[in-house]
Design a protein with these regions (language model features):
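Hydrophobic packing residues in well-ordered alpha-helices of helical domains and bundles
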Residues: 33, 79-82, 144, 148, ...
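Residue-level signal for well-ordered alpha-helical scaffold segments within enzymatic catalytic domains
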Residues: 38-45, 65, 84, 88, ...
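Active-site Asp-x-Gly
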Residues: 111-112, 116-123, 132, 164-167, ...
Length: 265
């Protein structure tokens, strides 16, 4: 829409949730657009992440400034620009892992109870949270959930205990990364929380198309442990793949099972 002051705006309206074919989803807490506005504000407060301005917010209504963009795929220039922003974002830290409120993932809310222990946070509020939902919805192959449970008891084999909390965007697929004339115009639709920054690095190649140009630039700002690529990248991809398996089934559940078996689950 274009109001009298000349600004172009985007209006997001949350319609009532339709009955899900999987009863599990209907029992979950509902996400609200106030959560999205809160997360956009948290990213804006860092001073390093371009985000749209919030003009008005209500539980089921969010009005944002329109961000003009012209790029659907990440060029090498775009990847380095994204790396600059994320490296600066990941410097922002907290005393614990989690966030002030749950964060929306599709129509459900992902828990973010504060925890001093990254491994227990990852196990309970990410892998097992989505694993239970995907299993209850019938989206996982036979034996996959049992393997996931076993894997979750052994996370310390691959993930160090001393990972620091970093503020992450949390949902960086290509549609949430907006460019204009080779410059990063905005990051939108966040699912923000404080996590091991490597979980964001693992997510990016799945759905955004980043490659060597991104990782080389990010590494120049914040050195990436070689063991991330060798041991942890696939492990950290389990959470988004479990979420996609929960919603869509199909090959996502198969890929989850492959990763679980790769780690001995």
């Amino acid at each position: 829409i274009a109001p009298d002051d000349g600004r172009d705006l985007v209006v997001k309206h949350m319609v009532p949730r339709r009955q899900s074919p999987h009863p599990t989803f209907g029992t979950l807490p509902k996400a609200t657009l106030k959560d999205e506005a809160f997360m956009l504000d948290r990213l804006r407060q860092t001073g390093v992440v371009p985000v749209p301005d919030v003009v008005h917010v209500a539980p089921d209504l969010l009005i944002l400034t329109f961000v003009d963009c012209d790029q659907e795929a990440l060029s090498n220039t775009g990847q380095t620009a994204l790396a600059d922003v994320l490296a600066a974002l990941h410097i922002h830290t907290a005393a614990r892992f989690g966030f002030d409120r749950p964060t929306p993932v599709g129509p459900v809310q992902r828990p973010n109870a504060w925890s001093e222990d990254w491994l227990s946070f990852l196990r309970d509020q990410r892998l097992m949270f989505f694993g239970h939902l995907a299993q209850q919805a019938g989206r996982l192959p036979d034996g996959c959930f049992a393997g996931l449970e076993k894997l979750c008891t052994q996370l310390d084999r691959w993930i160090p205990m001393n990972r620091p909390p970093s503020l992450i965007h949390g949902d960086l697929w290509i549609g949430n990364i907006l460019f204009r004339q080779q410059r990063l115009a905005a990051l939108i639709d966040p699912a923000t929380y404080y996590a091991d920054a490597e979980i964001e690095l693992a997510f990016l190649p799945l759905f955004s198309g980043v490659g060597a140009a991104f990782f080389e630039r990010y590494h120049a700002h914040r050195p990436i442990d070689p063991l991330f690529f060798e041991e942890r990248q696939m492990l950290y991809q389990l959470e988004p793949l479990l979420a996609h398996a929960m919603f869509f089934g199909g090959g996502y559940g198969t890929r989850v099972h492959q990763i679980v078996r790769h780690y001995g689950g």
